[in-house]
């Protein structure tokens, strides 16, 4: 029997506000433990919360960008549970009446087809503190308690781990582009839990689901869902009874591990938050927020394809972050060569950024300098290989390409006569390569070209070298 997965994702995004959701404490990441706290976020007796207006604005903004309906009347609720990272012993969240409902994200499948993944709801809530387990015991840092979150709950429309990854990538790019969250998974500002079950293909009856936590990267998400799918299929095939439970992804061993039996909603005893009034959102406010939404990544990608004539894949990669998209567009307008700009950004520049663990905003050079490098190559002033060396220097120093080329004497040699002398010398010193070429080994020419480039320290024009080596070899 063939099975398919039924997957839904619950994504928590920390909002990029300056202060917490119900108090004036800073949301800055990385402070000394328990220094960004006050009586309100610690839940001390007598303290009263006050809802941060910017949190509501960001909730509306996210909802509009994700094609949701905005609930004009909504409220906050208490979710009651006891855990050391929850200082009040309840979390102020939204239950029955969230701020947003009924949205969707459209993803593109491997075969080029588009698929809508429904979004059931978006609700606002506060984050919990952070536990640190040591040999001596467990420590708790409440700096994160009260940091504003939105939880985005998808419908169970996802059918493969690959679709789940595409959904999360698209969601991340949208949230970061509208600047409601920095979406830094490594810092925990974007966290994802997954719900998965399996059912026979063609069936409409979902199986017993498991919730998976601790999926803190796209790779972890895909691996965890794949593992859990295989575990469910094996159990169902053997006739075993699966129970609804919460599991965590163990990255070190590439398995999911049981945490606890899954709670039900009534275990949390939700009830309206009496210290906060019902929230009324006007049409005027919604329209004001709508005007602040910039061109979204998929819209920008479509424009790049139509305006700059680059491949769809390039456009999708370049618009994963708005900083990269902006750098590409500004460079292209100056270089007048969109494909070369795309190649440099997606290739050597991305590689060097990954090696140095930096982002586009950390680059020491600007779009005008990259455009200058591309123009130097297109004009034949330097070769593409020399261009890569110049780029390395630009990464380190931030100097302009022209200055680097002049200082290091990297101007390309286009003198056919001078290059021909080197070619003849190399051929004369390597008769075996010519013999190999005559015997049908065309790679022998590549060897000779490499020797010429080495002799000229990479300055000879590669096109001229290839032409002359081929001509001289065919004369022999």
Curated annotation (Swiss-Prot):
Keyword Membrane among UniProt keywords: no
Keyword Ligase: yes
Record Pfam families: GatB_N (PF02934), GatB_Yqey (PF02637)
Domain of life: Bacteria
Similarity comment text for this entry: Belongs to the GatB/GatE family. GatB subfamily.
EC number from the UniProt entry: 6.3.5.-
Protein's name in the database: Aspartyl/glutamyl-tRNA(Asn/Gln) amidotransferase subunit B
GO biological process: one example: glutaminyl-tRNAGln biosynthesis via transamidation
GN (gene name): gatB
Chemical reaction(s) catalysed: L-glutamyl-tRNA(Gln) + L-glutamine + ATP + H2O = L-glutaminyl-tRNA(Gln) + L-glutamate + ADP + phosphate + H(+); L-aspartyl-tRNA(Asn) + L-glutamine + ATP + H2O = L-asparaginyl-tRNA(Asn) + L-glutamate + ADP + phosphate + 2 H(+)
């Amino acid at each position: 029997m063939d099975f398919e997965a039924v997957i839904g994702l619950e994504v928590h995004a920390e909002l990029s506000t300056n202060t917490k959701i119900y108090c004036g404490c800073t949301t800055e990441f990385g402070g000394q433990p328990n220094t960004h706290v006050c009586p309100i976020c610690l839940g001390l007796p007598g303290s009263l919360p006050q809802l941060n207006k910017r949190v509501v604005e960001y909730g509306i903004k996210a909802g509009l960008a994700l094609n949701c309906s905005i609930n004009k009347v909504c409220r906050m609720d208490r979710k009651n549970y006891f855990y050391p990272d929850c200082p009040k012993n309840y979390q102020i969240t939204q239950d029955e009446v969230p701020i947003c409902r009924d949205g969707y994200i459209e993803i593109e499948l491997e075969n080029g087809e588009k698929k809508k993944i429904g979004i059931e709801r978006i609700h606002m809530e506060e984050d919990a503190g952070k536990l640190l387990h040591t040999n001596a015991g467990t420590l708790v840092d409440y700096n994160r308690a009260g940091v504003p979150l939105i939880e985005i709950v998808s419908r169970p429309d996802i059918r493969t781990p690959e679709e789940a990854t595409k959904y999360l990538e698209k969601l991340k790019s949208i949230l970061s582009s509208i600047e409601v969250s920095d979406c830094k998974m490594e810092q925990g500002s974007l966290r994802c839990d997954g719900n998965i079950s399996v059912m026979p293909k063609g069936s409409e009856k979902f199986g017993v689901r498991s919730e998976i936590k601790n999926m803190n990267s796209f790779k972890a998400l895909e691996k965890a869902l794949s593992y859990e799918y295989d575990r469910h299929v094996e159990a169902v095939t053997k006739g075993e009874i699966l129970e609804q439970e919460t599991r965590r992804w163990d990255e070190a061993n590439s398995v999911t591990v049981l945490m606890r039996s899954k709670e039900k909603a009534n275990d949390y005893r939700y009830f309206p938050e009496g210290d906060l009034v019902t929230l009324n959102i006007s049409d005027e406010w919604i329209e004001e927020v709508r005007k602040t939404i910039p061109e979204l990544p998929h819209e920008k990608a479509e424009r790049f394809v139509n305006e700059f004539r680059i491949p769809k894949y390039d456009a999708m990669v370049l618009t994963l972050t708005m900083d990269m998209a902006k750098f590409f567009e500004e460079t292209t307008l100056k270089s007048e060569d969109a494909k070369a700009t795309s190649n440099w950004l997606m290739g050597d520049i991305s590689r060097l950024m990954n090696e140095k663990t930096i982002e586009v905003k950390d680059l020491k050079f600007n779009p005008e300098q990259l455009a200058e490098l591309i123009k130097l190559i297109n004009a034949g002033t330097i070769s593409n290989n020399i261009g890569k060396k110049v780029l390395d220097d630009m990464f380190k120093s931030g100097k302009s390409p022209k200055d680097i080329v002049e200082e290091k004497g990297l101007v390309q040699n286009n003198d056919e006569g001078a290059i021909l002398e080197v070619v003849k010398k190399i051929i004369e010193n390597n008769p075996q390569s010519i013999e190999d070429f005559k015997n049908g080994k065309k790679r022998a020419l590549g060897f000779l070209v490499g020797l010429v480039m080495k002799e000229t320290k990479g300055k000879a024009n590669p096109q001229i070298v290839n032409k002359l080596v081929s001509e001289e070899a065919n004369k022999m």
